[in-house]
Amino acid sequence: SACNTIEYIGIETYNPAEITFPKNVDKVLIVNNAVPQPDDVGYTYNLYGTVQDTARAHADSALYDACHSLGKSIVDVSFFNDVLLYHDGTRQDTKYLVDEKLTPETVKELCRETGTDAVISLDRLLFRMEKDVVAFAEGFVVGGVDIEITGVVRGYLPGRDNPLATVYVQDSVFWSESADNMELLKLYLPSPDEALRAAGQYIGRKVTPNFVP
């Protein structure tokens, strides 16, 4: 059998960012202003044709991962002098479907507290995950995980009544594996929590070009 090796050659190209921050913005703060969806919302697990009513997936870590991934991707571009990740979520309510903007007072206080010039905030992030496992007569099983991601990310400047810009995000990620039995399939496919975290990391990277060239 023949083996082909694919070589990737890195070429640095810079396109204009979708959102232009003022030249005096030197340090930015990444903030999680989204509320995680409940564990029993947005996840459907279909096992051998039967929907499992005990399916649960935790989205709180995925929100953190999205912010962390966004911050790291911005750092890698070396556009701003410094990028900070705020240690706490900013919302205390449970209204996960509500897209709630940061208030001008909150933006001003966050920048004052952290010594930053602007805020990039994840204001909403929702996941819809479907997992399907099918058994074949030949004795093997096939499983797939499909996640649809929707979100809202905004740029804020202290002293402004309205956000600098709003980015609406919609994307998806997918895994598909086959195995001789169910136990092996579990090793190949990510767990529900792992899949959501991977989706969060992915969407954080995907949003980055909106804010940096």
Positions of PLM-derived features:
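C-terminal/domain-edge helix-coil "capping" segments
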Residues: 4-25, 154-213
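Glycine- and small hydrophobic-rich membrane-insertion segments that are intrinsically disordered
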Residues: 41-57, 135-144, 179-186
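Amphipathic beta-strand/beta-sheet edge segments enriched in Tyr/Trp
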Residues: 123-179
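N-terminal post-signal-peptidase region of extra-cytosolic proteins
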Residues: 13-14, 100-107, 133-140
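Envelope-exposed proteins and targeting segments
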Residues: 24-27, 39, 115-118, 145-151
